[in-house]
Design a protein with these regions (language model features):
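Terminal, membrane-proximal amphipathic helices
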Residues: 1-89, 114-261
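Glycine-rich active-site/cofactor-binding loop and its immediate structural neighborhood
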Residues: 85-103, 107-110, 114
Length: 261
């Protein structure tokens, strides 16, 4: 069974979104300076602060996804509304820098998750079901290179394959026992896997906001790029999942890898 012409166009669009320039490159273009400069202005304890903020944000996102996300029907996603909320939240991060991250990031992450769920619904996902909820959380791992990645092995399908077992174990645990024991190994492993990738992008955001004179306006713009990135990842991710519901998954991956962008 071949893939319809319109669906090939959608697949190409998804690949364009998913394999786009990195978050760091986009932030550097905004600032007009390499993002590495920002790391020079972070305190010695910044890695621990980012790790704690990232884990806290993803734990909150997991709770939000499992307990509150549903199938309210909307034909389109409210990308602009969520973007405005994230921009407003980012202004505080730009003003107060790293100390504000532990407060600002969980709020921004929840706003982004709402937007991701909105995009998922617009691509035909049933968000009341557990598997699509976990797929929404999976978006936070897209577009960030983990320390365990080797060279170019960071493409979309490679990341999904790397996370597959961890996601499956967490989904099975939640299906049986819910979130009653949040320190359960399956859930801890899921948060750790997501943190290893999402944390890289949070570090880049923190470094950008640490650059002197970035201010509230700069912080707001950085958050705009931050949510833009994850909205793009979500759109590409859920387009592919929609196509996988229509065609053989291996066929979709083969066609994806053949496409030039």
């Amino acid at each position: 069974m071949g893939i319809a012409k319109d669906d090939i166009s959608d697949l190409r669009y998804a690949k364009t979104l998913l394999e786009n320039p990195s978050l760091a490159a986009r932030i550097s273009n905004l600032l007009g300076t390499p993002i590495e400069k920002g790391f020079e202005h972070l305190p010695a304890t910044w890695k621990d602060a980012v790790q704690r903020a990232t884990e806290k944000s993803l734990e909150k996102a997991l709770n939000f996804a499992i307990r509150t996300m549903n199938d309210k029907t909307k034909p389109d996603s409210s990308d602009k509304t969520h973007k405005i909320l994230a921009i407003a939240t980012g202004a505080g991060g730009g003003t107060f820098g790293l100390p504000a991250l532990t407060i600002e990031l969980p709020v921004t992450t929840t706003i982004m998750l709402r937007s991701i769920a909105d995009i998922a619904r617009s691509e035909g996902e049933q968000i009341s079901l557990l598997e699509p909820k976990i797929a929404c959380l999976e978006v936070f791992a897209l577009g960030g290179r983990s320390k365990s990645d080797d060279g170019t092995e960071t493409g979309y399908f490679v990341v999904r394959a790397a996370l597959a077992r961890t996601i499956s174990e967490a989904a099975n645990y939640i299906a049986e026992l819910g979130l009653a024991r949040e320190g359960a190994p399956a859930l801890v492993k899921l948060i750790a896997a997501l943190t290893s990738r999402f944390g890289i992008m949070v570090s880049e955001k923190a470094a950008a906001q640490a650059i002197p004179l970035i201010g509230a306006a700069g912080g707001a713009l950085i958050n705009k790029i931050f949510i833009d990135h994850f909205q793009n990842m979500a759109r590409g991710h859920f387009i592919i999942r929609r196509l996988e519901r229509c065609y053989d998954k291996d066929l979709i991956r083969q066609e994806y890898e053949k496409l030039d962008i």
